[in-house]
Amino acid sequence: LKKNLSNLEESSKKDMLFEVFMARLDILNSYRKSIKNLLKYLSSNPQDFAKIFPSFAESIILMATISNIKVNGIKGLANIKVIMILYFLIIYTWNKDETESLEKTMTTLDNYLTNFDKLSFVF
């Protein structure tokens, strides 16, 4: 993910987080069939998500850090939780979006980020 975002331009946290999410989804798209199988498995065996949760949490923290979003303290914890919720919502949309351009996923992500951006305490 860091490699794909090495030339990420400084802009608003919302725009940067959008770019980070889309870079992540582009990577996942390369392994779409396997990721979809993993999501299907985890939905049937949610207890196994606990085994990969530490790596998932680190990934969310990395996404926030790259986007210049605070990850320390109470506000940082709230930011991490919001990004996790966004991630689950977007993965659900991505899983159903069969278009090559991921247009539906991009639109949904932008709408969610816009709504969260309106909340002054987030990000």
Question: Can you name each region flagged by the protein language model?
Answer:
Residues S11, R32, F49, I60, ...:
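Solvent-exposed interaction surfaces and binding hotspots enriched for charged
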